[in-house]
């Protein structure tokens, strides 16, 4: 999995950098626009209105800073959502990669270890050939479930106990921590 993580990390980092540059450019444009408006207002005022102008300028600068801060926050949220979308795309492309059989086998092993005495292993029909040897070795039945993607489910006796181990579920569970690390890496 470390090779996969490295590949994903490189792809995600490149996308993050591109998105960050785009977000920063947008924020700078908004900031420049706010500064230009404030400067135009300054030039339009007469000396007699200098005190009023300064108050208006302070309000405009505060509004501009708030607008920039809001735009940055929104851009950061968009960057993180784009990162998540691209990670999901990368995960969904894994079944087409040569390392997928080993990945799905490891997911199955983890699920079986988490549920001692499992009687069945459920997976997407396309993944069943990759799991036949493991199922035979562990003495569990293989079952197909087309809706189960990028993972497996170990099922206990009578089907009452189940342990699902899928990459998308792992991403969902870990997203808060991962997004915090991505944000820290990007924005400090």
Curated annotation (Swiss-Prot):
One of its GO terms (molecular function) is proton-transporting ATPase activity, rotational mechanism. Keywords: ATP synthesis, Hydrogen ion transport, Ion transport, Transport. GO terms for biological process: proton motive force-driven plasma membrane ATP synthesis. Pfam families: vATP-synt_E. One of its GO terms (cellular component) is proton-transporting two-sector ATPase complex, catalytic domain. Coiled coil: none annotated. The keyword Protein biosynthesis does not apply. The keyword Ligase does not apply. Produces ATP from ADP in the presence of a proton gradient across the membrane. Belongs to the V-ATPase E subunit family. This is V-type ATP synthase subunit E. It comes from Thermus thermophilus (strain ATCC BAA-163 / DSM 7039 / HB27). The lineage of its organism: Bacteria, Thermotogati, Deinococcota, Deinococci, Thermales.
